[in-house]
């Protein structure tokens, strides 16, 4: 690789659950482009999956992060300040919903699931961005992951669609708040892709087939497709881009009707 777009940059990567995670694909490509990375994991159970991945690409920093625990967030950023002093980009890659409610009717969403889904999937972006802002001394890039179900009704996506809609609105408001410090905030709206999280969605295989048959490129996206877009949004190539929802969905979002009968 002759051009290393992230050479000399440091980045915090959240949301890795296993080697099928979009966050992992982004991390791999960021590393290839010269970035020094810091991984987080949600729990001890996930540490067993994430630690070998960190070792695989030479990531020397890995920390537990529970975004529902303010102390956990503070500990992470205190460690980053101590080890790095500052850093350049953040990937917000986590989301949550009770899998038992990723089917049936949205109107049956429980209050507990509504609260937890919005807290982990959306409010955590605010908390991480607030902490990251103090350590992005020379500006930076914050990136999150969303999906078309934030804009249009997708069967069984339910509360996650509402959480992603809130996330996308938050991207715009955060971009406005943080722009004065030369911090850019964007989201990638990725097409459906097989991950640990997506496996919880009822009839997900049907969603994949419909997407591939409808999208102009006639295929589903890959983790590498998203990774390439992420590297662009982390790099100086996108220094004039903020507050954007960047589609990586093989063109699916432009289609009004797949076929006329």
Curated annotation (Swiss-Prot):
Any single Pfam family the record assigns to this protein: adh_short_C2
Residues that, per the record, bind NAD(+): 15, 21-22, 42, 66-67, 94, 164, 193-197
EC numbers for this chain: 1.3.1.9
Reactions that this protein is recorded to catalyse: a 2,3-saturated acyl-[ACP] + NAD(+) = a (2E)-enoyl-[ACP] + NADH + H(+)
Keyword NAD: yes
Binding site for substrate: 97
Disulfide bonds: none
Record SUPFAM superfamilies: NAD(P)-binding Rossmann-fold domains
Taxonomy, superkingdom: Bacteria
Catalytic residues (positions): 147, 157
GO MF annotations, alphabetized: enoyl-[acyl-carrier-protein] reductase (NADH) activity; identical protein binding
InterPro entries: Enoyl-ACP_Rdtase_NADH (IPR014358), NAD(P)-bd_dom_sf (IPR036291), SDR_fam (IPR002347)
Keywords associated with the record: Fatty acid biosynthesis, Fatty acid metabolism, Lipid biosynthesis, Lipid metabolism, NAD, Oxidoreductase
Recorded metabolic or biological pathway in which this protein acts: Lipid metabolism; fatty acid biosynthesis
Family: Belongs to the short-chain dehydrogenases/reductases (SDR) family. FabI subfamily.
Subunit description: Homotetramer.
Function in brief: Catalyzes the reduction of a carbon-carbon double bond in an enoyl moiety that is covalently linked to an acyl carrier protein (ACP). Involved in the elongation cycle of fatty acid which are used in the lipid metabolism.
PANTHER family linked to this entry: ENOYL-[ACYL-CARRIER-PROTEIN] REDUCTASE, ENOYL-[ACYL-CARRIER-PROTEIN] REDUCTASE [NADH], CHLOROPLASTIC
Name the record gives this protein: Enoyl-[acyl-carrier-protein] reductase [NADH] FabI
Organism: Rickettsia typhi (strain ATCC VR-144 / Wilmington)
